[in-house]
């Protein structure tokens, strides 16, 4: 009997050891990990414009746009950066003093500035920054795009810096789009398209606010924390979008419907650190230091990202000197229909699904933009130079469940080198 008990205990211990040797997966259900590259013009116009068939990146939201406006465009490269929570930092006098000191080269101001920034993030879900780089090609009715994107998420279920978690996310994506104009007359046109995105995503287990401050203050080694000291989840998905566009009056008025992020399931694995993830692709790419924690076995899991059904309209009369544009989108129609059947539906809930935008161009060189994104204003501008374009956008987004719960502002700047008229 004793031998049987000992055998069972040893089996349980062995099972526990095997289980413990596996890096547990980490999931963040409050973060939507669906991939979309930065589109500054789109942001300035209230994140509306799925029916607007201009600019090479329009096929990321509606692949039918490749059929509506065929031609040539090349971006080599594009680079964009977005910073969030600007207003809180500007209104914080101490934060601005530290920021000005940093600009003047005072490295001692980095830690107090980072502390104030984390304090101003508040509770709940937030974003700190987003950086995008990419190249793109539109050749007739075919679109190609390669994008690398880094996001810094923030999640705080408490009220202090100590309870704040920073979650870095990295995306590498290759997109192929095809759009065909099936009916083409001056009075009416019909286009349809599909785009496929091969996305590899990696995100870190949340890094505590205190650890971030240790890194900024020089009390912790950033390489050790990011490469070897923080578990990372990595995996792939192959989502695709489909879209149709109806054009009227020589495509000056367009009506569109899109289904975005279909098949948005990410097949993920857990890794003991980013260094081990990189070495899983190319063994020895990053030398493992002697004091690094031993790599644990990967655990496989899945992340579901939602697909959305969207409708849009755009009016862009073809004028020579002044080019006005008006756009309107209804986003995530399934959720809107669900809210209609709810006893708690309010008219203001419609604003959570309605995006509006307008643009006024002069000689197709200088452009001013304004929009409403789910009840919040956005503004922006763009200037086109020979083989280069600069776009800027500032606006607000809702990060809460209901309108007004957690609005966050952002400033986006994007520079494009190439030809994209």
Per-region residue spans from a language model:
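Positively charged n-region of N-terminal signal peptides that target proteins for export
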Residues: 1-4
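Bacterial N-terminal signal peptides
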Residues: 7-16
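Hydrophobic alpha-helical membrane context
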Residues: 14-15, 74, 273
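N-terminal, post-signal peptide beta-strand-biased segments of exported outer-membrane/organellar beta-barrel
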Residues: 20-144, 148, 263-266, 410-411
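Outer-membrane beta-barrel porins/channels
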Residues: 21-42, 126-421
């Amino acid at each position: 009997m004793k031998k049987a008990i000992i055998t069972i205990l040893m089996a349980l211990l062995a099972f526990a050891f095997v289980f413990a040797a596996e890096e547990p997966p980490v999931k963040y259900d409050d973060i939507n990990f669906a991939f979309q590259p930065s589109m500054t013009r789109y942001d300035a116009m209230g994140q509306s414009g799925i029916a607007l068939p201009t600019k090479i990146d329009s096929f990321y939201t509606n692949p039918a746009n490749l059929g509506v406006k065929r031609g040539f465009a090349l971006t080599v490269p594009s680079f964009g950066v977005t910073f969030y929570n600007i207003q809180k930092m500007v209104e914080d006098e101490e934060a601005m003093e530290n920021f000005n000191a940093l600009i003047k080269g005072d490295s001692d101001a980095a830690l107090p500035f980072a502390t104030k920034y984390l304090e101003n993030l508040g509770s709940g879900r937030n974003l700190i920054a987003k950086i995008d780089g990419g190249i793109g090609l539109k050749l007739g009715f075919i679109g190609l795009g390669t994008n690398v994107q880094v996001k810094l998420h923030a999640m705080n279920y408490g009220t202090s810096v100590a309870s704040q978690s920073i979650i870095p996310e990295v995306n590498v994506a290759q997109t192929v789009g095809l759009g065909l104009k099936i009916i083409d007359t001056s009075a009416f046109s019909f286009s349809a398209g599909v785009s496929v995105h091969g996305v590899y995503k990696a995100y870190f287990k949340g890094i505590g606010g205190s650890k971030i401050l240790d890194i900024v203050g020089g009390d912790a080694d950033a390489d050790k924390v990011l490469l070897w000291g923080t578990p990372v989840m990595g995996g792939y998905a192959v989502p695709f979008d489909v879209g149709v566009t109806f054009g009227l009056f020589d495509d000056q008025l367009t009506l569109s419907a899109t289904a975005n992020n279909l098949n948005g399931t990410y097949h993920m694995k857990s890794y003991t650190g980013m260094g081990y993830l990189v070495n899983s692709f190319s063994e020895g790419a990053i030398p493992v230091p002697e004091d690094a924690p031993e790599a644990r076995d990967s655990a496989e899991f899945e992340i579901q990202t939602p697909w959305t059904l969207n409708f849009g309209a755009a009016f862009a009369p073809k004028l020579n000197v002044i080019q006005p544009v008006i756009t309107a989108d209804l986003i995530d129609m399934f959720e809107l229909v669900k809210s209609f059947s709810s006893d708690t539906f309010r008219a203001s809930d419609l604003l959570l699904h309605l995006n509006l935008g307008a643009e006024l161009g002069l000689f197709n060189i200088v452009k001013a933009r304004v929009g409403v994104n789910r009840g919040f204003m956005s503004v922006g501008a763009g200037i086109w130079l020979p083989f280069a374009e600069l776009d800027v956008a500032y606006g607000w987004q809702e990060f809460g469940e209901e309108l007004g719960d957690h609005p966050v502002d952002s400033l986006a700047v994007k520079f494009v080198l190439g030809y994209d008229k």
